[in-house]
Design a protein with these regions (language model features):
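Short helix-loop capping/hinge motifs at secondary-structure junctions, enriched
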Residues: 107-114
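Glycine-centered loop/turn positions within well-structured domains
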Residues: 49, 56, 66, 79, ...
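Conserved N-terminal helical subregion
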Residues: 1-105, 157-160, 167-171
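Amphipathic alpha-helical interaction motifs in eukaryotic regulatory proteins
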Residues: 27, 31, 49, 82, ...
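C-terminal domain-closing interface element
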Residues: 283-295
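FAD/FMN-dependent oxidoreductases across multiple families
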Residues: 46, 117, 121-123, 131-135, ...
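Conserved mid-domain beta->alpha element of the FAD-binding
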Residues: 72-73, 100, 137, 174, ...
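Short Gly/Pro-enriched turn/cap motifs at secondary-structure boundaries
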Residues: 91, 124-128
Length: 295
């Protein structure tokens, strides 16, 4: 994809990152004390049973209760905290597509004359389309690793895929599903380690009317699950977090939390909802009659 002109328009470069690298960096930041902020303790394996938005109290499945000034529900597409928001009883569901995910060493692709031409350019995202399926490839980890998303009709891998992130996929099945693609692309797919291929259903959800209630606010996929066709899920979640940090300054009185969360919702809801809609449009099958609104 040639992004020179769009980068001039938006004034910001398009950055591609390996998700685990981003996770590790964020973890280091929050767990490392500085002169300005103490280290933040992380309590893993703490499954939520319910949330009281009015008192900002979380009850864990083991009965432990934790109370604070505000609860931020950033618990993903299968969010429990969403259910404490009026109108938030929606569930994400598959809309007909699944995706294989896997990594390939760029050196391995470059060393093969059949696949080298597909990966020779630095920092290039490539998409290969079929009418109802597509393969997305982009570099991560300083151009040393190629990250793949192979989107296809859900029915063709239904016996393997589910709604979790760790479901193992079958390399041979993937190659069969994309058998109509160029042989060089299939050779590139074949370089995936058979044990590293994952597959899951792509989930979407109707728009919820509000992201906040009393002293609870939603963030990221808990508020707006995105289909992956623009690669915006992580970026918009970070935007949510930055916006929340602005409206909830360090010395915000508890009595003002509700109004501040309403402001957060007003700032973020329309933008995220629009990106959700554009992601759906871009993900539509290429039938020749689905055009994005030029406006």
């Amino acid at each position: 994809m040639e992004l020179t002109d769009s980068n001039k328009k938006w004034l910001h470069p398009w950055l591609l990152a390996h998700r685990i690298d981003l996770h590790n960096h964020l973890k280091r930041v929050v767990t490392t004390a500085t002169e300005q902020y103490p280290a933040v303790p992380l309590h893993t394996g703490s499954r939520i049973a319910c949330v009281d938005a009015e008192t900002a109290t979380i009850t864990l499945q083991d009965g432990t209760q934790v109370q604070g000034d505000v609860v931020v529900g950033a618990d993903g597409v299968h969010s429990v905290t969403r259910h404490a928001i009026p109108g938030g009883q929606l569930k994400a569901a598959c809309r007909g597509k699944s995706a294989f995910r896997f990594l390939v060493s760029k050196d391995a692709a470059l060393s093969d004359p059949i696949t080298a031409r597909l990966v020779q350019h630095q920092g290039q995202l490539s998409i290969w389309y079929g009418s109802d399926r597509r393969i997305i490839m982009y570099p991560t980890s300083h151009n040393t690793v190629l990250n793949f998303v192979a989107i296809h009709p859900e029915a063709e891998s239904a016996t393997e895929s589910d709604d979790t992130w760790g479901q193992e996929g079958n390399l041979d099945k993937m190659l069969q599903i994309f058998k109509g693609f160029d042989p060089a692309i299939l050779s590139l797919l074949g370089k995936a380690g058979p044990q590293t291929v994952k597959v899951w259903r792509l989930l979407d959800m109707d728009v919820i009317p509000q992201w906040h209630h009393h002293r609870l606010a939603l963030l990221g996929d808990a508020a707006h699950p995105f289909l992956p066709h623009q690669g915006q899920g992580g970026g918009v979640a970070i935007e949510d977090a930055i916006s929340l940090s602005v409206v909830l300054g360090k010395d915000t009185p508890v009595a003002e939390v509700h109004e501040r969360l309403k402001l957060y919702h007003d700032i973020r809801h329309e933008r995220a909802t629009r990106i959700q809609g554009f992601s759906r449009l871009i993900g539509e099958d290429r039938t020749g009659d689905n055009e994005l609104d030029s406006k």
